[in-house]
């Protein structure tokens, strides 16, 4: 949740949502991060028995897809709705503006997974 929140902070445009005129970035984080937590939690329950390396990459892809979805929704509500963006322009802007935050946060997320896997293996061997 922390990495997802960081990703949203890095991506989200400043300003308020045009839906209610008062929702800020923290509101967006509180809206999407519980969903991310549930996705990761369910994934870990379903794929826990699978110890194959592909499982963690699938998790990273799921999280990345969720972040892009959240970025699109928030971009649409905080920036595009105040202007005249087509759906294609929204998608292009979201992908372009998501590159750096998503790369930074996916790398951090991966390093967290790697750290906890190594720690778990070390604890088993001790």
Where in the sequence are the language-model features?
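Transmembrane alpha-helical segments of multi-pass membrane proteins
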Residues: 1, 52-73
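Interfacial non-cytosolic loop connecting adjacent transmembrane helices
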Residues: 10-31, 70-98
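Hydrophobic alpha-helical segments of integral membrane proteins
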Residues: 8-9, 48, 69, 74, ...
């Amino acid at each position: 949740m922390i990495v997802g929140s960081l990703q949203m902070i890095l991506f989200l445009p400043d300003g308020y949502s045009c839906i209610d005129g008062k929702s800020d970035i923290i509101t967006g984080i509180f809206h999407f991060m519980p969903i991310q937590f549930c996705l990761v939690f369910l994934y870990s329950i379903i794929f826990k028995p699978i110890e194959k390396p592909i499982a963690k990459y699938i998790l990273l892809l799921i999280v990345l897809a969720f972040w892009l979805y959240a970025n699109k929704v928030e971009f649409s509500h905080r920036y595009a709705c105040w202007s005249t963006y087509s759906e294609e322009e929204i998608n292009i802007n979201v992908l372009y503006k998501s590159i750096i935050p998503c790369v930074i946060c996916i790398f951090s997320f991966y390093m967290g997974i790697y750290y906890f896997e190594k720690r778990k293996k070390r604890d088993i061997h001790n």
